[in-house]
Amino acid sequence: CAKFSNDNPNTTPDSHLLYSYFREFLDCGCKYVMMEASSEAFFRNRLETIQFDLSVYTNITSEHLNIHGTFENYVACKLCLFKQTKKDGTCVLNVDDPYYEQVKAACNGKVVTYGQDASATLQIVDYKVYPTHTLIHYKYRDEVIEVDSPLLGDFNVYNLAAGLLGALSVGVPLEQALSRIPNIKISGRLDLLTTNTPYYVMVDYAHTPNGITKLLNFVHTLDINRSIVVIGQAGERDSIKRPQVGEVVVKNASHAIFTYEDPRSEDPKDICNDIIKTIKDTYHNYEIVIDRREAIQKAIDMAEEKDIVLILGKGNETYQKLKTGTIYFNDEEEAYQAVANRKMREGVLN
């Protein structure tokens, strides 16, 4: 029970499996369960009987339309989390988000907020993002709190605020919550690899237009030259966003390499053609390399001093779902191997 890993392919498992996990946690003496409640889980009634003590809202962007049909249906499923929060529970909301009022109206429990707006329960006063850390000033109950966070990116200033306010809302003392922040590491999220090279390599889970845009905007605030992106789109999933991802990447990155990413039963070439559908006649800073291992190697081989290679879409996942079955594949391991291959060719020893 000291270490638990959910190897289930679903973000939120089916209800019978979920309850078996709860039983296991209870037998181990756990008092709290933190989980991600996906829109699909509400759509498929996996969470129908669960009431939440605490629910946290970050943002809503178009996603999973292959399941929900329309964006309105998607939002309706997202709101179920807050409707299923206990009356004596707490809803932690991003007050700066455009859908804040709609989410607030759905809340069954007490509402507390975070954001830059002066009305926020936990206000983001200011912050400065550095290449290795972020210095943040939050305001809580008229006290300004300085936080030195290992998490990078503007969006993580918000994510950390959400987590901190959530902890405070369930009774964790402020000093105890703050003491945990320096040790936070989120595998597969803004993972800057230790490559000992004049260029940088980062692995991240970003796979939606919004997530990719935020990531690339952050990366270009750093002292880098070119950004080289390796990314694909999943097969048998929301095909509407494929050309949107293509546009976002070529508009915000120096060069893009489109490749496969869990193609499942679809032809990876067809998926890549969907990605470039709206950019093929107007942009030329991209190429298609179907094999993901080859795509990663090509990106590494292209990198020059102060360039950054961004391998996106899978994060710390350890599989690829192909037509022939599921195979082991980890982007971080592949990146390290690609760097080693290049060093060997160039006679670099470290």
What is the predicted function of each stretch?
Residues 6-38:
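Conserved nucleotide-sensing/catalytic segment adjacent to the nucleotide-binding pocket
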Residues 1-3:
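Short beta-strand-centered segment that lines the nucleotide-binding/catalytic pocket of NTP-utilizing
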Residues 108, 162-174, 179, 184-185, ...:
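ATP-dependent carboxylate-amine ligase
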Residues 31, 53, 89, 254-256, ...:
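Conserved acidic residues
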Residues 13-16, 35-41, 72-76, 182-186, ...:
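Short gly/ser/thr-rich secondary-structure transition/capping motifs
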Residues 28, 43, 51-201, 224, ...:
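Acidic, Mg2+-coordinating active-site environments of NTP-dependent enzymes
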Residues 35, 55, 93, 113, ...:
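Structural beta-sheet core signal
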